[in-house]
Amino acid sequence: MASITLTPSEKDIQAFLEHYQTSLAPSKNPYIRYFLKLPQATVSIYTSGKILLQGEGAEKYASFFGYQAVEQTSGQNLPLIGTDEVGNGSYFGGLAVVAAFVTPDQHDFLRKLGVGDSKTLTDQKIRQIAPILKEKIQHQALLLSPSKYNEVIGDRYNAVSVKVALHNQAIYLLLQKGVQPEKIVIDAFTSAKNYDKYLAQETNRFSNPISLEEKAEGKYLAVAVSSVIARDLFLENLENLGRELGYQLPSGAGTASDKVASQILQAYGMQGLSFCAKLHFKNTEKAKKRLER
């Protein structure tokens, strides 16, 4: 879902309201002055003067205020930082987040290497090209282990805010290395409104604007590079955790994870499970029920 934030003049806001007055709808949010339900989009006009447009038709209505969408190809031809995470949907293993800095002169090399969204590449291909990317591309990789994940979730963070913290920190540390991107793109995992809300909790900040875009790994090579390196980091962590416990840990959160989790629970108890899995997943309760049979 597209999400666009603007700060137009009060005159333009009133003109917009007059034009779309039949689409005005009630809102329980005390910070929203006006809320409009339009075909393929919603528009929230805040007391601060900001406007949030969301939905497939967001760009169409944003054009009323002079907004012009940047073509994907033009964004691709900029020095760019792209970020992505892997492990969020897997019960076992940590959460890997990577920020990568890619310049246009590296595009041919990356395409010849076969860089693409990690979801479209085999694990074998990822393990093959990731070491090359780590050597050739400036990046910052972060891995939150399952044990640390379990420690912070429910305390200071939730499943979304912890990703905001990791993406922000990866970008911050990469910028500290001296790279100068003209654009920063995050593969969207939440709304811009949510991202900004959780970002306010973080200490390390930077002034560069960011763009949250859905399916960004298919649009920007910098995000694709991050996707591949993050997947490699996640797979390596999954293997290492399994080796220490003596089990082959599956990726994902299906019945295979339930089965292995129950075996680990029986052998090592909750301490062993906390070492290798994200405990707030439903798989934990399913594993317990397996042992009760």
From Swiss-Prot:
It is found in: Cytoplasm. It comes from the Bacteria. Manganese or magnesium. Binds 1 divalent metal ion per monomer in the absence of substrate. May bind a second metal ion after substrate binding. PROSITE patterns: RNASE_H_2 (PS51975). The keyword Cytoplasm applies. The keyword Cytoplasm applies. Gene3D superfamilies: Ribonuclease H-like superfamily/Ribonuclease H, TATA-Binding Protein. Its EC number is 3.1.26.4. GO terms for molecular function: magnesium ion binding; RNA binding; RNA-DNA hybrid ribonuclease activity. A divalent metal cation binds at residues 84-85, 187. One of its GO terms (biological process) is mismatch repair. Residues 78-293 form the RNase H type-2 domain. Its cofactor is Mn(2+); Mg(2+). Keywords: Cytoplasm, Endonuclease, Hydrolase, Magnesium, Metal-binding, Nuclease. GO terms for cellular component: cytoplasm; ribonuclease H2 complex. It catalyses: Endonucleolytic cleavage to 5'-phosphomonoester. Endonuclease that specifically degrades the RNA of RNA-DNA hybrids. This is Ribonuclease HIII. It comes from Streptococcus pneumoniae serotype 19F (strain G54).
